[in-house]
From Swiss-Prot:
Biological source species: Escherichia coli O157:H7
Alphabetized UniProt keyword annotations: Flavoprotein, FMN, Monooxygenase, Oxidoreductase
Role, per record: Catalyzes the desulfonation of aliphatic sulfonates.
E.C. numbers: 1.14.14.5
Disulfide feature: none
Lineage per the UniProt record: Bacteria, Pseudomonadati, Pseudomonadota, Gammaproteobacteria, Enterobacterales
Family to which the UniProt record says this protein belongs: Belongs to the SsuD family.
Any further remark recorded for this protein: FMNH(2) which is absolutely required for this enzymatic reaction, is provided by SsuE.
Identification of the protein by name: Alkanesulfonate monooxygenase
Molecular function as annotated in GO: alkanesulfonate monooxygenase activity
């Protein structure tokens, strides 16, 4: 099985060390463009663009990277409760059309009550997943070309439709990650690829089996992906030294503040990440070559695969054997590490190198009439 390898655009900051200004670097459009173009040339399938108040807007960043890349895909967040599904469907179709079919979408429900309140969202965990399920139903149906009437608990639309369809059919793939039961049920019923954070293989296997069984109950099959950091060097010793350097400027106060911030979220996945290290620096290798040091101060994906190319490739293949075909990777700093992963790791894997998409012909059309329909040429009999 060929593997889809993704990289990451660090729109929330970048540097050589975690939890300090030491070794940090400015992240501007030029720097993000360097990373995107490196990923494009090295054969990554795409890049994940993060979302949240600590990040630049993912949609605007993705749109700005389309003209400077050729085959790279952009995995961009959909935010139920923050955005209406009809607006999100129009945005998704436009991004897919402008990128010539290089748009992917990541459903993000949110987990920090404080940040959500700042966005005007006051739903609890269960309610957010109810709203996300309704959002996804409407979003998918619009991209499938339906005219949608929907009267849900959280979302109400009447006569919603999409005049400009996406390039990818039936619609651009939808990714999603969540560890709670309601999250897994949403994934099983509606998404195309389920993402998990980088837990030890036995825990990932358990989660995949749960989601796969729930999908089968809906008569569906879905794909699986994993989100990991990577520290790869020419030797294992060099890789572990690099891992230690990454947290060499961390103090206990910074770790405690970060863990307190993570604790206020209601994310089951974040709780599982925190349990891998319990905020302590000792015994961070939680599984062979799987290191939890990143999660001491970084929310979300908090583990890294550490080693030389063959060693890290062996660990990746262990995850692939569980049914994972997509790996969303990152490393600090992201420009240099994109090259290290491409040069030291990719040669030891069966990497699916994406082709440059050919321009897709669009149907001739006139100007939309009264914001309701588009006149099209009628075939002569």
């Amino acid at each position: 099985m060929s593997l889809n390898m993704f990289w990451f655009l660090p729109t929330h900051g970048d540097g050589h060390y975690l939890g300090t200004e030491e070794g940090s670097r400015p992240v501007d459009h030029g720097y993000l463009q360097q990373i995107a173009q490196a990923a494009d040339r090295l054969g990554y399938t795409g890049v994940l663009i993060p979302t949240g108040r600590s990040c630049e807007d993912a949609w605007l960043v993705a749109a700005s990277m389309i003209p400077v890349t050729q085959r790279l895909k952009f995995l961009v967040a959909l935010r139920p409760s923050v955005t209406s599904p009809t607006v999100a469907a129009r945005q998704a179709a436009t991004l897919d059309r402008l990128s010539n079919g290089r748009a992917l979408f990541n459903l993000v429900t949110g987990s920090d009550p404080q940040e959500l309140a700042g966005d005007g969202v006051f739903l609890d965990h269960s309610e957010r997943y109810e709203a996300s399920a309704e959002f996804t139903q409407v979003w998918r149906r619009l991209l499938l070309g339906e005219t949608v009437d929907f009267n849900g608990k959280h979302i109400h639309v009447r006569g919603a439709k999409l005049l400009f369809p996406p390039i990818q059919q039936p619609y651009p793939p939808l990714y999603f990650g969540g560890s709670s039961d309601v999250a897994q049920e949403l994934a099983a019923e509606q998404v195309d690829l389920y993402l998990t954070w980088g837990e030890p293989p036995e825990l990932v296997k358990e989660k995949i089996e749960q989601v796969r069984a729930k999908a089968a109950a809906h008569g569906r099959k879905i794909r699986f992906g994993i989100r990991l950091h990577v520290i790869v060097r020419e030797t294992n010793d060099e890789a572990w030294q690099a891992a230690e350097r990454l947290i060499s400027h961390l103090d206990d106060e910074t770790i405690a503040k970060a863990q307190a911030a993570f604790a206020r979220t209601d994310s089951v996945g974040q709780q599982r990440m925190a349990a891998l290290h319990n905020g302590k620096r000792d015994n961070l290798e939680i599984s062979p070559n799987l290191w939890a040091g990143v999660g001491l101060v970084r929310g979300g994906a908090g583990t890294a695969l550490v080693g030389d190319g063959p060693t890290v490739a062996a660990r990746i293949n262990e995850y692939a054997a569980l049914g994972i075909d997509s790996f969303v990777l990152s490393g600090y700093p992201h420009l240099e590490e994109a090259y290290r992963v491409g040069e030291l790791l990719f040669p030891h894997l069966d990497v699916a190198i994406p082709e440059i998409p050919q321009p897709q012909p669009l149907n001739p059309q006139g100007e939309a009439v009264e914001n309701d329909f588009i006149p099209r040429r009628v075939a002569q009999s």
